[in-house]
């Protein structure tokens, strides 16, 4: 039985296979995090320098390094988040493991066809 393709997987040149999508997810997370972190780092430095009224030469050195540090740090966190949210292509797993569906049916049929009854009357007693 063939599985339907996911939406957007028709054109492999644009999206690529599942591994490429995972790498793209990590890259996109890193870039978004780097942009947000650099902006946040710049805002913090600008507020700090406005409050202390320091010279502009020190501002330029500190602004660049702070933006790079905050952008890199937050970009790494967002890249890790993109890696954690990476989807696994289930069609490849099911093709490799043909007994996967069979095992699930066996487990469900065991529970549905079980003729054992449990005596739960001792649990119904309420004590106040």
UniProtKB/Swiss-Prot annotation:
Its main location: mitochondrion. It is found in: Mitochondrion membrane. The keyword Transmembrane helix applies. It is a single-pass membrane protein. One of its GO terms (cellular component) is TIM23 mitochondrial import inner membrane translocase complex. InterPro entries: Romo1/Mgr2. It comes from the Eukaryota. GO terms for biological process: protein import into mitochondrial matrix; protein insertion into mitochondrial inner membrane. Keywords: Membrane, Mitochondrion, Transmembrane, Transmembrane helix. Belongs to the MGR2 family. It holds the Pfam family Romo1. The chain crosses the membrane at residues 30-50. This is Reactive oxygen species modulator 1 homolog.
